[in-house]
Amino acid sequence: HKEYRRQRQMCIRDSVSDPQSAPKLLVGTGKEDVHLCVVLTSDRGLCGGFNSNIIKKAKNYFEKIQKEGKSLKIITVGSKGYDQLKRQYGNSIIENISFKESKNINYFDAAKVGNLIIEKFQNEEFDFCTIFFNKFKNVISQIPQAQQIIPLENENKDKDEKLESNYEFEPDEDEILSNLLPKNISTQIFKAMLENSASEQGSRMTAMDNATRNAGDLVDKLTIQYNRSRQAAITKELIEIISGAESL
């Protein structure tokens, strides 16, 4: 839920007593040179414009980053995203993750992606991380989203909120944040994967419904065409029989 996520992020930010010593996962590296983009798509097709809408959103962001002279790295989650991006951005794709064997989306899959991102961040492989997915609105409408997850996006930045804490901690602040921040990233990824999964199912249901309706319309059209051809053939045979009888 958006409000829960906002409150959780506010809680994490409020837990920081000294912005200068805050974890980099929270405040960033201070640079914007390398951007990591995590693109969530499906492993299966036949779901309408679901995948192409995410790819279009991601490509627009890629072009913007590259025009600014910044480096781009991509992690694709789902084989369809990899298939559509590998030709143009193959050199930028550093990982392709698939969950074909998973029957249902679960937190452990999200944590696997989250741990990979955190490991690469700790190895100083990127400065910013943005995740791309479809937000579920209803079965006929899914909205492509781009959400920054590293550093933690400040949703109250327009209010010029200060990053400082008035709380007392037990255990200490560093221990709490060292556990909470990685879980927060995995939770955000899990939320995006759930939104994406619901959007995929809605898009696939709509696509299959349209395909069934179109197939029904085609069958009706072909049935009418067949009956007309059959009727014309019968009429022609009757005319030939009558003409032959008259000639006798």
Model-flagged regions — what are they?
Residues 6-248:
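C-terminal beta-strand-loop-alpha-helix "lid" module of Rossmann-like NAD(P)-dependent dehydrogenases
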